[in-house]
UniProtKB/Swiss-Prot annotation:
Residues the record lists as N-acetylalanine modifications: 2
Annotated effect of mutating residue 115 to P: In a Hurthle cell variant of papillary carcinoma sample
Protein name as annotated: NADH dehydrogenase [ubiquinone] 1 alpha subcomplex subunit 13
Phenotype for residue 57 to H: In MC1DN28; reduced NDUFA13 protein level resulting in complex I instability
Subunit: Complex I is composed of 45 different subunits. Interacts with CARD15, but not with CARD4. Interacts with STAT3, but not with STAT1, STAT2 and STAT5A. Interacts with OLFM4.
An example Gene Ontology biological process: positive regulation of execution phase of apoptosis
Gene assigned in the entry: NDUFA13
Tissues of expression: Widely expressed, with highest expression in heart, skeletal muscle, liver, kidney and placenta. In intestinal mucosa, down-regulated in areas involved in Crohn disease and ulcerative colitis.
Organism: Homo sapiens
Region (Important for inducing cell death): 102-144
Length: 144
């Protein structure tokens, strides 16, 4: 048996073309100094805008406080009027309830003073529904 000849692969005539073996790195972008400058500029702009907004917010808050101070006497007068009306209604109800009790003085103060004592919520809402008393004592806290 004759051994077969092995054919070895060889380059093409004239050789292979040049191989590009250099690293192909993309462009690096901004330098470190420019990125630092942009960052510091952004921080300064943010600080300035927050400072500007805080001044505006403080101005609006002062305006709200001044409006509240201007309206406070009106609101206090309405509250006093409502309180006195409720006290009058309570006195009328007390007169109806206690009409058969001898020596009962309608509207006699439980405090031994002639000074005005603001009534407690229990005094004002003692003859009213529980819902009214809860609304007066807790207000709008139900909705939060």
């Amino acid at each position: 048996m004759a051994a077969s000849k092995v054919k070895q692969d060889m380059p093409p005539p004239g050789g292979y073309g040049p191989i590009d073996y250099k690293r192909n790195l993309p462009r690096r972008g901004l330098s470190g100094y420019s990125m630092l400058a942009i960052g510091i500029g952004t921080l300064i702009y943010g600080h300035w805008s927050i400072m500007k907004w805080n001044r505006e917010r403080r101005r609006l808050q002062i305006e709200d406080f001044e409006a509240r101070i201007a309206l406070l006497p009106l609101l206090q007068a309405e509250t006093d009027r409502r309180t006195l009306q409720m006290l009058r209604e309570n006195l009328e109800e007390e007169a109806i309830i206690m009409k058969d009790v001898p020596d009962w003085k309608v509207g006699e103060s439980v405090f031994h003073t002639t000074r005005w004592v603001p009534p407690l919520i229990g005094e004002l809402y003692g003859l009213r529904t529980t819902e009214e008393a809860l609304h007066a004592s807790h207000g709008f806290m139900w909705y939060t």
